Amino acid sequence: MKGSRPEQAVLSRDTDMSKTEDTRQVIEGMVDGLNDHRIGDIGEFFAESFKWMGNQGCGTKNGLQEFQDNWQKPFQAAFSDKVCVDESRLFMGEWAAAFGRQEATHSGDFMGIAPTGKRIEIRYMDFWKVVEGKIENNWVMVDFPHVMAQLGKDCFDGHGWEAYDSGEKQAPAPEA
């Protein structure tokens, strides 16, 4: 990269490391709450002004009510018998991150795909900011293309880069 570089890690630069254990307790309690399929009282862990920022297909939820109505309810309607398994968690001051998977049964409509009854894996990454004992912000990546593939739908219509990995297609390279 030529020229000046963008400023990095602005949001977490001044984190208060003394809050690490408090953050851990909030996140661990929240994950337990999600595994218990709590919706109505999940506000125990989230600020009312909570913002949930997901990738394309997931959307952005402004406030706890939108999160409950436009994420939790449709997600639980589409996927039953689900369990969240964080494979790794990191805690740093008011910040936490995790990646893992949810294992669930496709029991309701999802992205226009009728229920299949298949047991599937939903991979994700989460980054949380906890302030005064409540989650204020949550940046989320949910691997919906992987979910759709398990349900028989290729959202890349055969143009996913997995074709490079398998040798089906030759990967392009930038011009010198």
Regions found by a protein language model. Give the residues of each.
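A short, structured loop/turn motif at beta-sheet edges
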Residues: 89-97, 129-136
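Short, surface-exposed coil-to-beta transition loops
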Residues: 83-84, 121-125
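A cross-kingdom feature marking solvent-exposed beta-strand/loop segments within repeated
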Residues: 56-58, 105-120
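Short, solvent-exposed aromatic-acidic interface loops
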Residues: 139-148
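A solvent-exposed, acidic/Ser-Thr-rich amphipathic alpha-helical stretch
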Residues: 21, 40-94, 101-103
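Beta-strand elements of well-folded, non-transmembrane domains
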Residues: 35, 104-106, 130
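Short, structured motif recognition centered on aromatic/hydrophobic residues
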Residues: 24-28, 52, 72-75, 125-128, ...
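Short, low-complexity N-terminal intrinsically disordered segments enriched in polar/charged residues
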Residues: 2-48, 156-176
